[in-house]
Design a protein with these regions (language model features):
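Conserved acetyl-CoA-binding loop-helix of GNAT-fold acetyltransferases
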Residues: 82-96, 229-232, 238-251, 255, ...
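A short beta-loop-alpha structural element at the N-terminal edge
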Residues: 4-19, 28-30, 141-155, 163
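Conserved GNAT-fold acetyl-CoA-binding loop/helix
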Residues: 25-42, 163-183
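Conserved GNAT acetyl-CoA-binding A-motif
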Residues: 97-107, 253-265
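Conserved donor-binding loop and adjoining core beta-sheet/short helix segment
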Residues: 22-91, 200, 208-228
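Acyl-donor-binding surface of acyltransferase catalytic domains
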Residues: 77-139, 285-293
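Conserved active-site alpha-helix within GNAT-family acetyltransferase domains
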Residues: 108-124, 243, 255-256, 267-285
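Intrinsically disordered, low-complexity segments enriched in Gly and acidic/Ser/Thr residues
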Residues: 175, 187-239, 243
């Protein structure tokens, strides 16, 4: 756009960018109350980026960060009074990332912002969601324990196999049984985790993992816990085992006074996408993804 000036993001832009982000988050809270509140918006602005100025007024900003594998725009990484300007900012910033994989997190309730990224060839990869806990218990569900580790290995291998199949086509690599055992070995001694299993006829056929996630980003409300994992064996899918795990997790959180449960899932995982939406989880953010070229 000829009347727009694009500049590197600097400290002089912090105040105006934080104001844009605050406006975006206020709109988001109007549609979904279970998000972060009392936010220091300046502190949320992380990474290197660019701004779009019109007549000297900041109208949009974009901040990115890189890992060894990809580049990403986090929950506070973009906001705009004129969303179309984000396309110009991406064109200016993305070459600096020198990464083929790009991901961006945008509010699910902001269609103008989502549309901009769709028109930059990004697609929806993950849904991040939230809901309130409610009283309840799941039939056949109990707390997990260390002697469930053999079944945990079986469930984790089954989950990886499921994600690698169509239509997910995940690049997730199958770990060895020993690697899974090592990953899970300390779970039952770590107070951040709550492991649940569901039994049928005396056999564990599924499990769930609750995780006390640290607050700090716009997605995480106060006093929440994350439902990090729900997996059942293929032969019991559709029999209510997964529903029992979720009901028990919601009830466990309710009994302990949590105000919210967060979750995320891969939308191309058809079982997960339909299952969690049907259980009252409301989308808060979309993780959009693009592979270049």
């Amino acid at each position: 756009m000829p009347d727009v000036e694009i500049r590197p993001f600097s400290d002089e832009h912090l105040g105006a960018a934080a104001a844009l982000l605050a406006e975006r988050h206020e709109r988001h809270l109007a549609t979904e109350p279970l998000l972060a509140r009392d936010v220091d918006f300046r502190a949320q602005l992380r990474g290197e980026g660019v701004v779009a100025l019109r007549d000297g007024v900041l109208r949009a900003y974009l901040l990115g960060q890189t890992t060894d594998d990809d580049a990403f725009v986090d929950f506070a990484g973009c906001a705009a009074a004129e969303p179309e300007l984000l396309r110009d900012l991406y064109a200016a910033l993305a070459p600096q990332w020198a990464r083929e994989r790009h991901r961006v997190y945008v509010p699910a309730s902001d269609p103008a912002l989502v549309d901009v990224w769709f028109r930059l060839a990004f697609g929806l990869q993950f849904t991040l969601a939230v809901r309130e806990p409610v009283a309840g218990r799941g039939d056949g569900v109990r707390l997990g324990r260390r002697d469930d580790l053999d079944t945990v290995v079986e469930l984790e291998q089954s989950f990886t196999d499921h994600l690698r199949e169509a239509p997910s086509f995940s690049g997730r690599q199958r770990e060895t049984d020993e690697e899974i055992r090592a990953d899970w070995q300390d779970t039952w001694d770590d107070e951040r985790f709550i492991h649940l299993v569901v039994e049928r006829d005396g056999r564990v056929v599924g499990h769930a993992l609750l995780y006390r996630r640290e607050p700090g980003d716009l997605r995480i409300p106060a006093n929440c816990i994350d439902l990090a994992l729900v997996v059942t064996l293929p032969e019991v899918r559709g029999t209510g085992a997964g529903s029992a795990l979720v009901a028990h997790a919601l009830g466990w959180a309710h009994e302990r006074g949590f105000d919210a449960i967060t979750i995320d899932w891969r939308v191309v995982n058809l079982l997960a996408d339909r299952f969690f939406r049907a259980r009252g989880f409301r989308p808060t953010f979309m993780r959009l993804y693009r592979h270049v070229p």
